[in-house]
Each structure stands twice: as C-alpha cells, then as structure tokens.
C-alpha cells in the first residue's frame, strides 16, 4: 500500500487533529468534506447543522494550515437515498433508526472509500474514537477507543474486512482533552468548537417535525392502548413515538407510563408501566461479523442495544444472516431499528439491526 490518505474533515476538532497526526506520520494527505445535503433543501438553517459553510471554511482553514490540498465532495444524492429516506421510512414503520450507522455504512466507508481509490489513495482517515488492529491470522479487528467515554465502535460495527484494511483512526489511543490540546497548540480555528450533537440534519432535536416538513405529510392522530388493548387516550401520529419514551404522552396514570410498542398498521401506540419494558431475547438481521467469519454454536459476549447502553452479558447464536442474543438479565426498552453490537472484551465481534424483541 502507498502512504496516501484521504482525511474526512467535518470542520470539527477531532477530524482536524486526525489530519495533523497523519501529516506528522509522514502521510501524503488531502482533506475532504462530504457535502451531504443542501440546508435549504431540507428546511434547516446553516447554523444548526453539519455541512454548513462555516464547517467547510473551518475544515479548509485547518487543511491549508497543514499545507494540505482540500476538496468538497458532493454526496447529497446518496445521502438523501441512503440516510434520510431510510430514516423516514423507519419511523413511518414504527422503527427507531440510527442514521449515523447508515452514514458510515453507505457514505464515509463506502462512497468516500471508492472515491479515495479513484484518487489512488489507499487510506480513509476519520476522527472517530476507535482502533483498528490486525490479529495473528491476518484478520482486521475493530476495537474500542482507549477513552471509553468517547468510544464510537458501536456505530462502526458495519465495517468490512476490506474497509478496515484501508481505514485509520488516529484518535483511538488518546483522550478528547488531548485532541483539544493539540488543536490549540496548532492554532486551529476550531480548537474550542463544541462537539456535534444529535442528528446532523435534524434541527432542534425534533425529528418528527423534520419528517413532516421534509415529506409534506400529515400523520394522523390515533389511539393510545394499554397492555390489554383498551383505549386510554389519543396520540399525535406514530412517528412521534419510540419505545421507552415517557415525555409528551399527556396521559394521567397512578405510575409513569412509557411507550411499549408502535403499530403503524393499526395507527396505535401501546403504553405500559416501566416493568413492561424489559426483554431478554433480541434478534438482529443484516449482520456484519468482524472478529470472526461466523459464530459457531453459542458464544458468550457482552452486547449493546443502543449507543449509550452499557454492554451486558449475553449468549449469542447465528442463523444465516441473523443473530440472536439471550441476555443474562432483561434489558430495558430494546428498540427495533437500533443496532445490536457484540463485544469480546474491547474487540467488536460484530453486530446487526434489531428486528425482533421478546
């Protein structure tokens, strides 16, 4: 392989420091910002999103300070198809998606990787907090970042062996505070820039408002049901609810009520008390295995069912393109559409999209 790399630059601190570290290692680097959407096309202001002109200018400033060529690649068509449309379709079907995983799967480590190959560059570099290593059998491994509070391996479980072999995560062995210190020492314009939060294309955290504005649809009110199927109130459209949600229900009860299930076919939302949210068996499809080519028999792992979840002990089995995890202890508010990610210590075994919960 050559020492030529494409640095995916968002305009934030982490990708800027990743670029600096790669230059320090002697790599021939070019900086690239992926233009994922035109803000006016999806009805948000530039101040509240990534891909804004400010972000592009921040990335350009850092690239130039590092004497590194810089380009903006327009991937907006793919982003609309592979991320936004999938995001909307999921909520319309009572599923809670993770668009960051789709963006990694279809854009950062697919479309950008293919563009890097066209430019005769062997590596894609990002500011993710994770690590890539190679085991004694020549298999590439995805590992947690040393800074567990910033670890992003959960949203990277979809990377293939081919992609991992051409991916570098320079920040995987440092803390966020160290990254900021480097940015400040180099005088980067974005050294004190706040970390990005929530979903990049959703303004003010209201994903349901975004969906209604983007699609032009009005999602009809429907019935809230209790666990026995009795009508106990009215909801404001199924896209506004996700499993485990308590806020915004507007239902009085002796104990707090939570969303247990969303059924777009009947246009109903089932509510339950907290003790009705627990489940032990989680099935995932569209799987990607990293540390092993397949899971034979039963495998003991720790597993996460959402990004901020602390991984828990489970026994996992594989059946074709699905995996089933049986947790030692019931887990709260496991949600279809999120990722089930398996860990062996700090190594990602693999994962998939949750399709069934019992």
Residue ranges with predicted function:
Residues 1-157, 168, 177-178, 184:
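ATP-dependent adenylation/nucleotidyltransferase module used to activate substrates
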